[in-house]
Amino acid sequence: MNKLLERHGINCEIDRWRDRGEISQLIGHKVVDVHYDDELFQILTETHIFTLYHESDCCEHVYLQDIAGEVSDLIGNEILKAEESTSGENPLCCGEESFTWTFYKFATIKGYVDLRWYGSSNGYYSESVDVVVTKLNK
């Protein structure tokens, strides 16, 4: 989970319980770099690392389903908008007992980047995306 930190030679421990945050905290930060795969999206700023992922318990699956826009438009620019919304409509598969879409919208002077996360479960486990905001030790 710390590939972005390793790439920049930063030694910092991400603690999902201590550093739980809101995506709106990203507004006003200048983005240095971004790393993502289907289970993780990290944004490194000059002072913090913002990590979006899902801490799995048992019987759920949450993943980054789609990205609209150019992620590179975030790098080197200040975040002007950072919003989260969710929807419980239009499941990807039929027969899923419970599902949640989670959307993140980021804006810079260069454009928008939208993330679409999809979570499904048996109805007893969280399908939400965890947002962890960690202050860098410099």
Regions found by a protein language model. Name each.
Residues 1-138:
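Surface-exposed, interaction-prone regions used to assemble/regulate multi-protein complexes
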